Regions:
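A gly/proline- and charged-residue-enriched helix-loop-helix capping module
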Residues: 54-91
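Hydrophobic faces of well-ordered beta-strands that scaffold small-molecule active sites
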Residues: 47-49, 247
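Active-site/acyl-donor-binding loops of N-acyltransferases
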Residues: 17, 21-22, 40-41, 91-117, ...
Length: 313
């Protein structure tokens, strides 16, 4: 089995640093790490397995879901949210109910088991030119393992959020990732600077085989310098130098709608070469069925109210 980074011991340490209770179990053909998420005013309590459970057979999936059901019942939670990886399955066979996006169901990966020249040759010509010439524009690249440097990424992400009118993770969430993951070599910070000013930054997750392009932001003011392109190209090549086998660009859309909210960064990621990988849709396994039905009905009603308010505006 090959668990995703979000099922790793490093991710468990991060979740525990946020004050969350984490449970880990395994058996024949299955294993999982589940996070206890207490109930709120808008949602009942649940167990959440990000990109899990990890299984190697249908029997293993059945056993994992049985173990999760038993754990959830003992904790008094109302449902379990899962994203099983390892086998193809029919959700109806396991009473799983598909829900809207939690983690991306598809990702884009680059095979690093080739020479750097071969990897670069698969990038679009514009990307290759930017990678080869960005230093001539006065730009420089560096890697940091210092958690204090996360402030540069956080600042850029706030700029991205303001410019694009999107919501991002809290400063505490991102800083805690840096505080926990960087000292144990499970993450890196990457920067492109113009003279001494950071204009593009990214945080990658790192395991033995894979580099995950997790969080990234760049200055809109300096967008014509294509710092984001130079940064990702450097991340890919440095992952190769570190002996990684895969660079996972972490989430794309398969929609052909040019107006899809992920269309832009999907095109950006695909421009570096690579291939699509199907992960898992997100599913709920109700434990307390009556409470879960009320939760779904309330969520549907809130969605309708939001849509109505948007039309009125």
């Amino acid at each position: 089995m090959n668990p995703h980074f979000l099922q790793s011991a490093a991710w468990q340490s991060f979740q525990e640093a946020l004050g969350r209770k984490v449970y880990r179990q395994k058996g024949i053909d299955w294993e999982f790490m589940a996070i206890l998420e207490p109930g709120t005013r808008l949602s009942p309590s649940r167990l959440y397995c990000p990109y899990g459970p990890t299984v190697s057979s249908i029997k293993g999936l059945k056993s994992a879901l049985k173990a999760l059901t038993k754990l959830a019942t003992s904790l008094g939670v109302k449902f379990v949210r899962v994203e099983p990886l390892g086998v193809k399955f029919n959700a109806k066979d396991f009473r799983l109910k598909k829900v809207n996006y939690s983690q991306p169901a598809h990702t884009w990966q680059i095979d690093l088991n080739r020479s750097s020249d071969e990897i670069i040759s698969q990038m679009k010509q514009n990307n290759r030119n930017i990678y080869r010439n960005y230093r001539k524009k006065g730009l420089s690249y560096r890697i940091s393992n210092n958690p204090n440097d996360c402030k540069y990424l956080i600042k850029l992400l706030h700029g991205v959020a303001a410019h694009n009118n999107i919501t991002i993770h809290s400063d505490k969430y991102l800083q805690t990732q840096a505080d926990v993951l960087l000292p144990i070599n499970s993450a890196k910070l990457h920067f492109i600077s113009l003279e001494s000013k950071v204009i593009a930054a990214a945080l990658t997750y790192e395991d033995e085989k894979t580099c995950y392009y997790a969080h990234a932001g760049a200055s809109h003011e300096y967008r014509k310098l294509s710092a984001s392109t130079a940064l990702l190209a450097e991340i890919i090549i440095n992952a190769k130098k570190d002996g990684k086998l895969i660079c996972d660009l972490y989430g794309i859309t398969t929609s052909q709608d040019k107006n899809h909210r992920w269309a832009g960064f999907t095109r950006f990621k695909k421009s570096f070469g690579g291939y699509e990988v199907d992960l898992s849709e997100t599913y709920d396994l109700p434990i307390n069925k009556s409470v879960y039905k009320l939760y779904q009905a309330a969520k549907f009603l809130r969605h309708k109210i939001v849509k109505l308010k948007q039309r009125i505006k």
